[in-house]
């Protein structure tokens, strides 16, 4: 069997990856990166990187006159694993997560999506053996791990800046400031959701992730985006009773999606389970309708909910301000 290689970016479309040493340290001494932000999207590998990074930090010595040995930013697989390892290593840690739940990118997977298919080793827990495990089961397991171990997570706390502080750092968030010897960045590449910047977007009917398709039963829903997450959201909604689904995408084709998703959308469109508007953009969001600009001209759609799946704004500018160097990978391992 041929070996599997991890490839970053494509030949034409590069991806910015932080410059990180084999010990997960950036060019800024004391700031580490593990998991998806560093290019590792596999759950098992991300969790392993989180554990290994904490081991490096443990060997470096104590916090000195700082409040924490390490501030861990992001509670996806890498951050969760790092937090457990910090407890096991008796480090003074602070784990923060900008959203209101753990799981990182996994939390944003569609319902019942297979999330992990390989064993993973977690500090305090040991080796966890899964066959194919769905998103919901994996998140429930992680919740159980948090309760069992007493892992402390600061939810809805978003990193806004990192300033040098003697031989350590001050991590500034929307909740305050944390003095720490080291910083471990384990947030994903989603960043904050990319917004449409159109009138009416601030209304409650606009969301940036699909959590439970059943809550939209019987509604007219607009899904905006052309990636796998947008297509999977539209397909999940189209399965619900009485739901009227329109998928709006600004380009002329779904060129960057999995073949199975493209085929499923084409089939659903043929069966009239959903409507696809390519080369369209949202102009305005109103209480009971949305205004689109389409290749055929202006269009008004009946609407009770808008789900924007337009990706995220990467944290690259913030990290560059901290001093972290990036390199653009084009289809390279």
Indicate residue ranges for each PLM-predicted region.
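A Rossmann-like FAD-binding core segment of flavoenzymes
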Residues: 1-2, 113-114, 119-120, 133-173, ...
